[in-house]
């Protein structure tokens, strides 16, 4: 019991001290397959460890939602990510709604929590009432520039079939609350990728309202 109380106190102290990276800054865009190699070449020149080959990844991502019988929309949505190419823990991820905030802010900002888990996390979610909505695979390249992470990836269905003839490009940073200055650094970096790719704040609510 004492250990549980101590763990709860430590977590509360971490939250109050703003040392937990629970906020994601995000810009997204896409680039045609025919131009992707040019973007990868540009990123090799701009990012850290330019002498090494970019890190590759191949993941399966599953989206689970928890719904109440009286509600049409899910009360909570979480994602489970599993690496296909390396032995690594599964990642349980909660992603919140984008903050409204200042419309002049250069990036989208949303709550985000990532937790390493055992393979039993899927059974755990099912027991809690979560249901699998959909799953997909991603395969691509990852670069780093300081705290910034840049991924260039293909989204696949059935693990092998691309859903489009373009790559998804994402620029993101996980940081504690109160570090909004990183958004300006991301904007400056994104400018260096033009005109190859236009990284923007994506308004998903606008897509949901489309007929």
UniProtKB/Swiss-Prot annotation:
What is the protein's major site of localization? Answer: nucleus
Q: Does the keyword Oxidoreductase apply?
A: no
Q: Its GO CC terms?
A: core mediator complex; mediator complex
Q: Which domain of life is it from?
A: Eukaryota
Write out the function statement from the record.
Answer: Component of the Mediator complex, a coactivator involved in the regulated transcription of nearly all RNA polymerase II-dependent genes. Mediator functions as a bridge to convey information from gene-specific regulatory proteins to the basal RNA polymerase II transcription machinery. Mediator is recruited to promoters by direct interactions with regulatory proteins and serves as a scaffold for the assembly of a functional preinitiation complex with RNA polymerase II and the general transcription factors.
Similarity-based family: Belongs to the Mediator complex subunit 18 family.
Protein name, as recorded: Mediator of RNA polymerase II transcription subunit 18
Question: What organism is this sequence from?
Answer: Anopheles gambiae
């Amino acid at each position: 019991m004492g250990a549980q109380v101590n763990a709860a106190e430590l977590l509360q102290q971490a939250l109050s001290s703003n040392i937990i990276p629970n906020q994601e800054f995000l810009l997204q865009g896409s680039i045609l397959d025919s131009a992707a190699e040019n973007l990868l070449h540009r990123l090799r020149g701009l990012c850290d460890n330019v002498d090494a080959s970019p890190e590759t990844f191949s993941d399966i991502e599953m989206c689970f939602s928890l719904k109440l019988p009286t509600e049409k929309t899910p009360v909570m949505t979480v994602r489970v990510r599993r690496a296909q190419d390396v032995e690594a823990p599964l990642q349980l991820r909660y992603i919140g709604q984008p903050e409204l905030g200042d419309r002049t802010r250069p990036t989208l900002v949303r709550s985000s929590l990532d937790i390493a888990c055992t393979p039993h996390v899927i059974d755990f979610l099912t027991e809690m009432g979560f249901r699998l909505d959909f799953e997909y695979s991603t395969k691509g390249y990852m670069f780093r520039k300081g705290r910034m992470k840049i991924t260039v990836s293909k989204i696949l269905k059935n693990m092998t079939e691309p859903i489009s003839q373009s790559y998804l490009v994402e620029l993101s940073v996980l940081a504690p609350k109160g570090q909004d200055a990183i958004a300006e650094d991301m904007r400056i970096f994104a400018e260096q990728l033009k005109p190859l790719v236009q990284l923007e704040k994506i308004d998903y609510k606008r897509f949901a309202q489309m007929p």
